[in-house]
Amino acid sequence: MNKLALYCRSGFEKELAAEITEKATALGVFGFARVVENSGYVIFECYQIGEADLLARKITFSQLIFARQLIVVSDLISNLSVQDRISPIIEYYRQQEKILNLKQSSDIWVETADTNEAKTRAAFCRKFTVPLRQAFRKQGWLQAKNKKSGITLHIFFTQSNSCYIGYSYNNNHAEHIMGIPRLKFPAEAPSRSTLKLEEAILYFIPPNQEATRFNENKYAVDLGACPGGWTYQLVRRGVFVYAVDHGKMATSLHETGRIEHCAEDGFKFRPPKHCKIDWLVCDMVEQPRRIADLISQWLVKGWCKETIFNLKLPMKKRYFEVKRCLQQIKERLNEQHISFQIQAKHLYHDREEITVYIRLM
């Protein structure tokens, strides 16, 4: 196994290929990315044996922007028999036992790409998981007592009779099958954009810290808030929100008594002087560098402590633009000797955008 399989949103394969190549090179690992446009994944092939495993351990998954999952995989296994796909899969894993401790495996995920073409395979993957898991347990696999330090086995079907076989490290991978969190749209939310902020909070904020970072003692500003999809996520967590937008906010949010609607331009709005703002959130449709400059201003001036915002990406040179915007923010903060934590992710509910989280330390 000397390849990495990385999942992504369909159409972002080139960005992911550029990112993984850059990360690998920084670690002294060289290889090449196999990219099929709109396939929903990238295969990165290393030149030296053992280097794919090295990357899976050394690249911090949470620092990858466009990857939904990070898996060490085999060569593509083709022409699997419809009558028996399980036996050759088990045999391949057996051949890896000298270098891979399968008794440290905790689960098996059968996956496919997140594309319209692959949707027909998704149902098969779910059904195939049950007998495959049973067969693996008979081998003495999937028995890891400490899941956090174990591995997850992956079968990634590119066709119904072709798959990559591999594994990921539980302490350095996405926690969801296919890297996709399953969130339910709340009926009372004003817009579907609410799922973007919900996913961002679940991704960036540790579960055991959420109640202390979002509660009735916290204040937030939502720039470009109308009709209130992002404001809703803050209000339901108890936060008081200054909702900034010339448009109307949902009546249901006004009825909570936890918002103040400020009919102003998000770029000109200034925080109220009578309270300290804990959170700034922003999902305005604007040039990414303009948003990066706006967020930098809020952070440098100390107008907020934490922020979650989206950068809308151009049609071309998207990875280049992301890097430039993030570097722009980092340079502004470093110039002022401000300590900070920053993460960026192309979340499942994002489309032509990425979500960025910054916390002042």
Swiss-Prot record:
Gene Ontology annotations for the cellular component aspect, listed alphabetically: cytoplasm
GO biological process: methylation; rRNA processing
Catalytic activity: cytidine(2498) in 23S rRNA + S-adenosyl-L-methionine = 2'-O-methylcytidine(2498) in 23S rRNA + S-adenosyl-L-homocysteine + H(+)
Active site: K312 (proton acceptor)
EC nos: 2.1.1.186
Keyword Membrane in record: no
Compartments (UniProt record): Cytoplasm
Main location: cytoplasm
Top enzyme class: transferase
InterPro entries assigned: RlmM_FDX (IPR040739), RlmM_THUMP-like (IPR048646), RNA_MeTrfase_FtsJ_dom (IPR002877), rRNA_MeTrfase_M (IPR011224), SAM-dependent_MTases_sf (IPR029063)
Residues that coordinate or bind S-adenosyl-L-methionine: S193, C226, P227, G228, G229, D245, D265, D283
Record-annotated disulphide pairs: none
A GO term, aspect molecular function: S-adenosylmethionine-dependent methyltransferase activity
Entry keywords, A to Z: Cytoplasm, Methyltransferase, rRNA processing, S-adenosyl-L-methionine, Transferase
Subunit structure: Monomer.
Function: Catalyzes the 2'-O-methylation at nucleotide C2498 in 23S rRNA.
PANTHER family: RIBOSOMAL RNA LARGE SUBUNIT METHYLTRANSFERASE M (PTHR37524), RIBOSOMAL RNA METHYLTRANSFERASE FTSJ DOMAIN-CONTAINING PROTEIN (PTHR37524:SF2)
Entry similarity comment: Belongs to the class I-like SAM-binding methyltransferase superfamily. RNA methyltransferase RlmE family. RlmM subfamily.
Annotated protein name in UniProt: Ribosomal RNA large subunit methyltransferase M
